[in-house]
A protein has these predicted regions:
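Structural signal for interior beta-strand "rungs" in well-ordered beta-sheet cores
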Residues: 5-6, 10-132, 137-139
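Short, glycine/charged-enriched secondary-structure capping and boundary segments
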Residues: 128-129, 146-148
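C-terminal structural segments of small proteins and small subunits
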Residues: 151-154
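Charged phosphate-binding loop/patch that engages nucleotide di/tri-phosphates or the phosphate backbone
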Residues: 157-170
Length: 170
């Protein structure tokens, strides 16, 4: 469902898929080849939310902002199931693991993997190519080439999968 709010209207490239029970509110931009899965909520009622080309937001995730804290998801990013993103920036080609929480003004670099249930605190900067686990999240090493390829394959799966869903769910 798409909802306008206070003259803020979601912008949809039209070349993507939004599950019938996902909720997109206000100042949200969906670039092409994105997918927003079941029960996800993207609430752009305070600041802008941008979902970059080729990215996916999986089931039950919540994306929100605060004043002065817009939310940007880069290109080809996987936001796993039940993730909470709040007023943060996610770099291109990154994977945010199941149940992770990333808070205001945190900045996740490109090609990062944020492990399941990780907590990235406010204002935390995660360098490019980092593998982060724990609560609070800590960089434990660089992402390997094999892991980078696996992230790409996961993202590609969701880019292909939404096209199947768009033809079978009405």
């Amino acid at each position: 469902m798409f909802y306008d709010l206070k003259n803020k209207k979601p912008k949809n490239s039209g070349e993507n898929w939004v599950a019938p029970n996902a909720t997109i509110i206000g100042d949200v931009t969906l670039e092409k080849n994105t997918s927003i899965w079941f029960n996800a909520v993207l609430r752009g009622d305070i600041e802008n939310i941008l979902i970059g080309e080729g990215s996916n937001v999986q089931d039950g995730s919540v994306l929100h902002t605060d004043p002065g804290c817009p939310l940007k998801v880069g290109k080809n990013v996987t936001v796993g199931h039940l993730v909470m993103l709040h007023g943060c920036t996610i770099g291109d080609n990154s994977l945010i693991g199941i149940g992770a929480v990333i808070l205001n003004k945190a900045n996740i670099g490109k090609n990062c993997i944020i492990g399941a249930k990780a907590l990235i605190t406010e204002n935390k900067v995660i360098p490019d190519n980092s593998l982060v686990v724990g609560s609070p999240g800590k960089v434990i090493r660089e992402v390997s080439e094999e892991e980078r390829k696996a992230v790409f394959e996961n993202t590609k799966h969701y880019q292909d999968n939404w096209k199947k869903y768009s033809k079978s769910i009405f």
